Amino acid sequence: TGAITPVAKVNPVNIGGVVVSNATLHNEEEIIRKDIRIGDVVKIERAGDVIPHVLSVDLKKRVENYKKFVFPKKCPSCGSKIIKDYNKNTKKFDAVQRCSSEGYKCEKIAIEKIKHFVSKDALNIDGLGKKVVEKFWEKKLIRFPQDIFKLDYNKIENLEGWGSQSTSNLNYSINKSKDIS
């Protein structure tokens, strides 16, 4: 989607048996509303027992010179302008800011699109999960969804963690995905 989601880097803390070192800040409006500043002591919870997010700031522990977070104007991945979509129904701009890059020009957007393309919600290709997509991207084996159907299996077989059997299994899964019923 190209959404730019700010994340708080926090000292590791155990929440419900899980060590948390990152917490979502949701969007710029939430940061402003909660007056979250760089260096603040914050209270974190795991929303729905899953995603850690900043609940509040301990203002008693705030140091006077803590700086306000300045939301970037350009995508940290590709440098394109960051925009807010206008919602015609509400007649307001959405809270979520997005990279304005189109197609597959932004690396982060391209990788996420490919991950979705091969996911259980789309082609459901066994053996081609998120980490594999990232590895294939890093090795320049894929840049677009259609590249999945033109993979160089000789190069894949020579990658660390891959061999003839895993490569053969991937080839089978990709060919099987062509027969969508």
Over which residues does each language-model region extend?
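RNA/tRNA-interacting regions in translation and RNA-turnover enzymes
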Residues: T1-S181
